[in-house]
Amino acid sequence: RSSDLWVGTERELRINDIGYEYATSAGEGVTVLSNEFLTGGVTLGARFAFRERIARLPDREVSLGTKWPVLSVNAFRSFTGLWEGELETWRVNASIDKVFHIRLFGDLSLRLMGGVADPNAPYSYLYNLRGTNGGGTKEDPTLLLAADNTFQTMVANEFLADRYAAFHLKHSFGTLLVKGKHFKPRPGVVYNAGIGDLSAPLNHRGYSFTALKDPFLEAGVVVDNILSGVGVGAYYRHGPYAFADTNDNFVFKVTSSFTF
């Protein structure tokens, strides 16, 4: 079996200079707004992969995978006074990954992940659900590169949660459907779902966001490796957070897949 455990400590100053302010009560009728957060904390990480095969090279170790699910856990806890820290907060994340190699049908990759954070923490210590459809609004998407295990049609920072769960699925047919001498595209399908909640939305000022109380759903079709590791993907947003205009629910991206 293969298992890793690491513990660390850190001092970090986070400053938001693009309009966000964190609101705290300083007494009856008095609210204090802040955009600077100094923390001193302890980090803990663990990874467990049962019967993982490892190739040992002269300068590093390379994982050859395992037929069992891989569990990863990360936790953070800050303390007032540690490394002069001024904020006490915490959060815990976990994920389970599994790849099924299905003979004559391709590879099915699954990831189940989730997290819980201090409900009274500032914005940057919570979860934005990893939306990768641009950096601002749906009218002006700026990032058109697909990333696995993220939400392709969700605008960056569109949602905010202090607890969430997400499911990511990708099935790649490999070269089973089309295979030429030089042209070896890899068609596949993608499905992503997520849900969460936000306990104290009024603590966060200056940003426009939605608390993810209903399921966020999207489906996609990809063709990887059309040309030298580069492909294309088309994704469709549906469910409770679908836009009224059907065209706004479609997102097209470039995919990349390189083997080293």
Regions found by a protein language model. Name each.
Residues 1-260:
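Exposed, low-structure sequence patches enriched in small/polar residues
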